[in-house]
A protein has these predicted regions:
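Glycine/proline-enriched, intrinsically flexible loops and inter-domain linkers
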Residues: 1-268
Length: 268
């Protein structure tokens, strides 16, 4: 599609006519530099891990929680897509006798010639309530959640690599608005450094503001961590209970005093 030359210029032609002629130095500059002031605001002094669910008793609270849009099943949406394309799927989106247990990771065998048990395992992490309370904490726990899902499915967090999806309200001249993505990126960077795991960057969007009849609404500060790692397909653990008497284990995590993840505890 192109010929590499020693002119240090990128030239594009339409027929014999030059339509683009840019210097390599200009391309390397990545465009004009932009500067903005950012102010990271204080967070509300409350326990972000406790969410008040309405109901007089446990049964009512359970049903109320299941009606939360962030908890409800997305089976109808998932079934609109063919999860078997490519014949590489190791775990179907839903497992169990009734196919009602949702899988928390995506496991796909690598498309190589012949047979292989080598697969990729990918999971995402994001808590909108936590990110709304503090983008810094929310971004940090996005990485922890992605790692937790991979470990629960039989993968190794130590070999994970990440890419992020960011989504924030429309940026203005207000330093507090710029403080939200700044805080989220700092939280993400802190987790990557403490866990020793790298990210290749990600996709960002700063257009999450919408005009309605009652005014402008904004998306909550959003940083979703997508983590992927190689895995042997034979070692993958599906989430459904296999036999009567199977045990479920809770690996409890105690946050630090500032409510950030205790990565040293989690590593153990």
């Amino acid at each position: 599609v192109a010929e590499v030359t020693d002119t240090a210029r990128m030239r594009m032609f339409y027929g014999d006519k030059v339509v683009v002629d840019l210097s390599r130095a200009f391309i390397d500059s990545a465009g004009a530099k932009h500067w903005s002031k950012a102010t990271i605001g204080a967070v509300e002094d409350r326990d972000p891990f406790f969410r008040d669910v309405p109901g007089k008793n446990l049964k009512e609270r359970m049903f109320a929680n299941l009606q939360d849009p962030n908890v409800t099943c997305q089976k109808g949406l998932i079934e609109m897509f063919d999860s078997t394309i490519g014949r590489s799927t190791v775990l179907m989106p839903f497992g169990g006798e009734l196919q009602a247990t949702e899988t928390q990771v995506s496991v796909q065998k690598l498309p190589v010639k012949g047979y292989t048990d080598t697969a990729s395992m990918m999971a995402f992490g994001f808590n909108p309530d936590l990110c709304e309370w503090s983008p810094y904490h929310g971004a940090a726990y996005s990485f922890i959640e992605a790692c937790s899902k991979v470990v629960a499915a039989g993968g190794h967090w130590e070999t994970m690599r990440f890419s992020c999806q960011e989504y924030f309200e429309r940026m203005t001249a207000d330093p507090k608005v710029w403080g939200k993505p700044t805080a989220a990126l700092l939280g993400a960077l802190k987790m990557q450094k403490e866990l020793g795991l790298a990210s290749i960057g990600g996709k960002d969007s700063m257009s999450g503001s919408f005009e309605t009849e009652s005014g402008t609404i904004h998306v909550p500060p959003t940083l979703i961590a997508f983590g992927i790692t190689p895995v042997n397909a034979g070692n993958v653990i599906s989430p459904e209970l296999k036999w009567e008497g199977d045990r479920l284990y809770l690996v409890k995590h105690t946050p630090l005093a500032d409510r950030m993840p205790d990565t040293e505890q989690l590593k153990r």
